[in-house]
Amino acid sequence: MLPLVATGHAAVAGSPALCYQGVNLSGAEYGDRNGVYGTNYIYPSERTVLHFAAKGMTIIRLPFRWERLQPRLGAALDANELKRLSDSVALIRKHGMAVLLDPHNFGYYDKGQVGKAPATNAAFADFWARLAVEFANREGVAFGLMNEPYDIKATDWLKSANAAIRAIRIVGARNLVLVPGTVWSGAGSWEKDVLGGANGTVMLGVKDPLDNYGFEVHQYFDVDSSGTHESCEGADNAVKAIAGMTTWLKQNNKRGFLGEFGVSSEEACVEALSKVLKTMGDNGDAWLGWSYWAAGEWWPPGEAYNVQPQNRRERPQAVALNAALDPKVAASSDCAMVKPATN
């Protein structure tokens, strides 16, 4: 698995520090496939990227729409959209942060579920082969296979994930791959048989010849873990979920990445957020890191989880995130970028 550096005040003795701590910059996943750039969707501005880099964050999860990048399954990537994505990656890397590429499609291409025609596993693998070629072995670029597959059986999703990983490796890309589970890839349900087997059992079948992968999970703090409520009745469950996921990762010698999590500015929510951050910070042997949901220029100012800078004032959630960062890690050449596997 990707090596981490054993530095940083947040790590317990013998535990590496978290290298990858950042945010999702939402915007490129907005709208439908026919959306107009600059009108219906955007990519991050340098001002926003610079803000989070200056805080000491080390990774940006970058959502985008599969259909816009590849308008026809099995065909070439759209040159204009690929350039926008590539330019955004270059901008983020310019400011010293890693990038997690995130096709934000919930396990679908248009209305076709991954694994079924027309979005077959072969089509999914073809997409990843084409995208992987563009970013193969670039330091600072990791591949998130898919955002939140939710209604695919775990056993079926495993086949899709393995097909994509196989395609990525066949084209010679050694980049870190982050693999979600099904059922929204929830940390709290990871070991529960919700749909076609538990992620925590089925996804142990992931096959990567380079063994350069981790599992991406998501966890929200509201009553139903959906990330759609301002209150946080599920805060205790969220804290327990991350603790449980930590145990599972250690027992199975795996690495995890918390790709989405968010809370409102309510005091109890922020307190729970800090507990989750501490759990991960204390267990760098299990966690690669995290990316908070979310920020982005077009996020409504009143959106409860929003940490986009406004009027030069930091929201309480952002203060908690900043407190979890270690400037020594951000400055470390070993932690500033996702390195391709060398084996």
What would you call each of these model-derived segments?
Residues 1-6:
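Bacterial N-terminal signal peptides
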Residues 72-74, 112-115, 269-272, 302-305:
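Short secondary-structure transition/capping segments
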Residues 275-343:
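Extended, alpha-helix-rich binding/interface surfaces that flank or overlap catalytic cores
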Residues 15-200, 211, 287-288:
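Active-site mouth of glycoside hydrolases
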Residues 26-27, 181, 218-219, 294-296:
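Residues at the C-termini of beta-strands that transition into short coil/loop
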Residues 62, 259, 293:
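The conserved SAM/SAH-binding core of class I Rossmann-like methyltransferase domains
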Residues 8-13:
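Boundary at the C-terminal end of the N-terminal hydrophobic targeting segment
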Residues 41-42, 126, 133, 137-142, ...:
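Extracellular glycoside hydrolase catalytic/binding regions
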